[in-house]
Amino acid sequence: MLSFIFKISRFRFWIYTGGTYVVGYALGASVIGDFFRPEYYIYLFYFFFPANIFIYGVNDYWDYETDKLNPKKDEKEYRIHNMERKRLLNVIYLITGISIILMLFQNLTEIIIFSIFLFLSYFYSAYPLRFKTRPFLDFSSNYLYVIPGIFAYYLVTQSIPSTIILIGAYLHISAMHIFSAIPDIEYDRAAGITTTPVFIGKRLSLLLCLIFWIFLSLIVINLANFYPLSFLVFLYPLFPLALLLSGNIKIEKIYWYLPYVNTALGGLLFVALIIDKNILGIL
């Protein structure tokens, strides 16, 4: 059972919820003691593991038919078999139960933020809303990956991050979603799923990613007061730019480098926040 749960959680993407949570918490933390609060570790575990089980478990359950056409499920992810669907549903119920228990100990604002995360995580794939089949709503609903960071920030500060940070997060997560959906254009179209890349085509999708990531880069550099390392954020627009300028690069290959870039830059941001705030109290 544990092996099954691990497979559906898509460990390559744990960083997308867990990492966001850690960075959001570091952004709000002011003293080293903030990292010794028990609730920090409770939600650290939740957003790294159970949250991913919920997101991708729901996705695998509702995409069972369409996933039959996508070879990615055999190469990089786990393909759910028909006899496993009931077990998968039980796992989703389990994580839902854990989530409800956590909400019993949250204040009203925390419940609202947490509920938004669960709502978007579920209805991104599930009917009747199924945001993933609605152009422009598909990448917008992917803001679910930002919510753990907002929740963490509120957990430690009892306030919401600034608007410019929320906008920058939207630009990044939108570009990430569009970029990840481009390799699936052929399979989504065959399955009758109209994602943004299916709707506007590969080239316009790459251009939209380029625009989003350029604006994200400008926001990050400005917020960092032009600190030299902040210019590493320009790695993101290089991905769609390279594909737009060259016909020899396959997006299916370079897409799988993005989790490494996200992990490296996310880790760098976490360390930078700790140092900048002198949270360790060593300066």
Residues of each region from the PLM?
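Multi-pass alpha-helical membrane architecture of UbiA-family
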Residues: 1-283
